[in-house]
């Protein structure tokens, strides 16, 4: 792979960090140094915000909607032209299976297309008021948006935040996770090549705490859009409250997967493993708590475990691979801590939970070549835990790894209490062929995104976000664009 992005992207050009600091990136599939990238400082963050403010005042905020749409459509086209390059970059950077990486780059391009088309439909309204006259509303851009994105879906989430913010007439300072900055840097470069003016989209790789705090507290930043852990989201809210800065937060999850006996439970059992193990479980929407009606529990578990054992875990560069490594050694260690606690509690493991390595170009069961090096990579077998005590950490806390807990239920009302006792409320699935039950349970589950007889969580056209400690505000759909605008009311007397 040639010419990896290695610097900050500010004012339409790459430049070194002011301190010349650099960070090392590790390929999680090989445990080898992949590349180095510049690490921004708070001073770099301040400079990027001030540059973005100048770009906003200098013309982006007032650019004709049709011209803004033209640029966003152009960004979508250039992203599709570079899809394979970006997918390979993501695969090497975070161990994302190459087929998933391609899908995610395509999703990012689709997001830009959607918001390019939305620009001409984003407007206020006229309002009849009691005293007569003319009353109407305007949707106006906010200014500089700080977008802080995670390492698990770095490219699509960067697009989820940048595209609607740009479409609404804002400028964006994008802070990718320190583990996964490369596709974000290319996004900035390609967007500029597609016609986005200098300073409208800045990209700052670097340490999350220092750069994030600098962005959140900068007086010119009008809104912070963050996806990541609940703990960091709480910290951002505290900082933003000092000057009443707007925030939107997409945080943790402990999503339920509810399977009733009248459902097509065989299909649910076949498809449910990937609803929790996809992306090696590093997904805030992972259906990590499975509730199965007791009459089908044993048969469901048998089929679920069989489907789990068939998953292809291995080298993410291979087309057939479904699950790659965890993103880092520390992330694997964190997941293993949960599994160790479960073992100490006497939890039953139906399968998985062990560490293994994968030789280059090999699969899960491949042997290293004769005389070769030991297997490498931050791999962990998908773990299926049964009859889990609801007081354990594995049941209560977000693991962010390939671990699922399955329990039986007898009573719908008690099951719903167990579902909703979680402090999280992001996503979930309900499996039943009874439409009345499906709608009743969907209304009762305290989650922002639910699917019935499906595991789908994300649609570009629909709002995405959670209840409770899973966050506030919404990504995607027209709701996201509204969240990047100010609503102004104007009254004209007769």
What are these regions (language model features)?
Residues 31, 68, 90, 112, ...:
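Residue-level signal for inorganic ion chemistry
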Residues 32-122, 132:
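Glycine-rich loop-to-alpha-helix module at the N-terminal edge of alpha/beta enzyme cores
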Residues 16-17, 22-23, 38-43, 263:
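A short acidic/small-residue loop/turn micro-motif
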Residues 231-360, 365-389, 452:
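ALDH superfamily catalytic-core signature
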Residues 30-36, 221, 258, 312, ...:
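Conserved C-terminal structural/oligomerization subdomain of aldehyde/semialdehyde dehydrogenase
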Residues 34-40, 57-61, 147, 257-260, ...:
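Short, well-ordered beta-strand elements within core beta-sheets of diverse protein domains
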Residues 1-29, 55:
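Hydrophobic face of amphipathic alpha-helices that form TPR/SEL1-like repeat modules
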Residues 123-267, 409:
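Rossmann-like NAD(P) dinucleotide-binding subdomain of oxidoreductase/dehydrogenase enzymes
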């Amino acid at each position: 792979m040639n010419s990896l992005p290695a610097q900050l992207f500010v004012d339409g050009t790459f430049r070194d960090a002011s301190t010349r600091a650099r960070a090392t990136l590790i390929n999680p599939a090989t445990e080898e140094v992949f590349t180095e990238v510049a690490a921004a400082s708070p001073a770099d963050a301040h400079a990027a915000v001030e540059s973005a403010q100048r770009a906003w005042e200098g013309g982006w905020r007032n650019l004709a909607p049709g011209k803004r749409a033209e640029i966003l459509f152009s960004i979508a086209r250039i992203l599709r032209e570079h899809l394979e390059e970006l997918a390979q970059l993501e695969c090497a950077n975070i161990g994302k299976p190459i087929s998933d990486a391609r899908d995610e780059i395509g999703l990012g391009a689709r997001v830009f297309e959607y918001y390019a088309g939305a620009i001409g439909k984003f407007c206020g309204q006229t309002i009849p008021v009691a005293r007569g006259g003319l009353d109407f509303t305007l949707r106006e851009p906010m200014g500089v948006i700080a977008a802080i994105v995670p390492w698990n879906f770095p490219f699509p989430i960067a697009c989820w935040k940048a595209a609607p913010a740009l479409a609404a007439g804002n400028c964006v300072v994008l802070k990718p996770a320190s583990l996964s900055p490369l596709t974000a840097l290319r996004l900035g470069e390609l967007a500029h090549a597609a016609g986005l003016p200098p300073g409208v989209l800045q990209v700052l790789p670097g340490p999350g705490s220092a750069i994030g705090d600098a962005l959140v507290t900068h007086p010119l930043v009008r809104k912070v859009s963050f996806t990541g852990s609940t703990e960091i989201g709480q910290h951002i809210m505290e900082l933003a409250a000092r000057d009443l800065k707007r925030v939107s937060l997409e945080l943790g999850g402990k999503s339920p997967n509810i399977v009733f006996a009248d459902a097509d439970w065989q299909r649910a059992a076949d498809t449910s493993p990937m609803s929790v193990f996809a992306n090696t479980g590093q997904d805030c929407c992972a259906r990590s708590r499975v509730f199965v009606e007791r009459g089908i529990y044993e048969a469901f578990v048998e089929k679920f475990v069989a489907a789990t054992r068939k998953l292809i875990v291995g080298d993410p560069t291979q087309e057939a691979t479904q699950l790659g490594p965890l993103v880092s050694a520390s992330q694997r260690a964190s997941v293993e801590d949960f599994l160790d606690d479960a073992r100490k509690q006497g939890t039953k493991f139906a399968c998985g939970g062990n560490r293994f390595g994968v030789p280059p170009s090999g699969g899960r069961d491949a042997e290293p070549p004769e005389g070769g090096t030991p297997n490498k990579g931050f791999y962990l077998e998908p773990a299926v835990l049964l009859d889990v005590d609801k007081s354990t950490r594995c049941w209560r806390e977000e693991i962010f790894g390939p671990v699922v807990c399955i329990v039986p239920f007898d009573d719908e009302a008690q099951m719903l209490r167990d579902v909703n006792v979680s402090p999280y409320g992001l996503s979930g699935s309900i499996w039943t062929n009874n439409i009345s039950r499906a709608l009743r349970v969907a209304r009762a589950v305290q989650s922002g995104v639910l699917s019935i007889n499906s595991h789908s969580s994300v649609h570009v056209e629909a709002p995405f976000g959670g209840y409770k400690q899973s966050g506030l505000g919404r990504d995607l759909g027209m709701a996201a664009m509204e969240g990047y605008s100010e609503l102004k009311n104007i009254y004209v007397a007769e």
